[in-house]
């Protein structure tokens, strides 16, 4: 009975084809999907930080640097499924990412960050122009001191890797195309020789001019 109930809810939220896809991959979707969907009844993110379920081992899931999801090296092409999974990602103190539900957790292999910024827009918020970023799973993040931007420079290649905080300790890699657009809009700080953008009154550095 619980399996039928779970299937009906999954069918409504993520589609029968998505459900059958994971069923064919031998993942325990009944508990996984039902746990996620129950936690999302009020359109809120599940409280993954409160859950401490046992680890479900030997599940090969990966998020590539470009944000694409894989299961056993096969791409997960169902957008609704990926969006659903993205709501229960947790980054633990052991340095690993997990998909977490009340009944089980699955370790994720993440090549860089679990999210990727694909586009941005500028809007006036409280009388100030701010940058709004959109992730590959359609999260909207307003650049601010609460959701800051930072840039890491590779010591060998000197290539920048820009990130923005999405929620808690989960960051998104800003795609190269978006970063180049930000650089074009940035203003040079003559004192620090850094390129800066202003979002809602908060200033963020994109790096020094070489």
Spans of model-derived segments:
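N-terminal amphipathic/basic-hydrophobic helices that include classical n-h-c signal peptides
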Residues: 1-22
């Amino acid at each position: 009975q619980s399996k039928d109930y779970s299937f009906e809810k999954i069918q409504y939220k993520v589609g029968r084809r998505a459900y059958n896809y994971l069923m064919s991959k031998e993942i325990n979707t009944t508990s996984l999907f039902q746990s996620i969907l129950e936690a999302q009844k009020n359109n809120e993110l599940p409280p993954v930080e409160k859950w401490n379920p046992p680890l479900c081992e030997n599940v090969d899931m990966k998020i590539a640097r470009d944000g694409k999801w894989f299961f056993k090296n096969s791409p997960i092409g169902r957008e609704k499924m990926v969006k659903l999974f993205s709501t229960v990602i947790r980054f633990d103190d052991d340095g690993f990412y997990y998909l977490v539900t009340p009944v089980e957790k699955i370790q994720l292999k993440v090549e860089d960050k679990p999210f990727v910024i694909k586009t941005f827009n500028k809007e006036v918020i409280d009388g100030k122009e701010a940058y709004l970023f959109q992730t590959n799973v359609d999260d909207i993040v307003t650049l601010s001191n609460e959701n800051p931007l930072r840039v890491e420079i590779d010591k060998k290649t000197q290539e920048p890797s820009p990130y923005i905080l999405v929620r808690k300790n989960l960051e998104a890699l800003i795609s190269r195309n978006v970063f180049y657009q930000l650089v074009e809009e940035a203003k040079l700080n003559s004192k620090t020789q850094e390129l800066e953008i202003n979002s809602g009154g908060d200033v963020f550095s994109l790096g020094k001019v070489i």
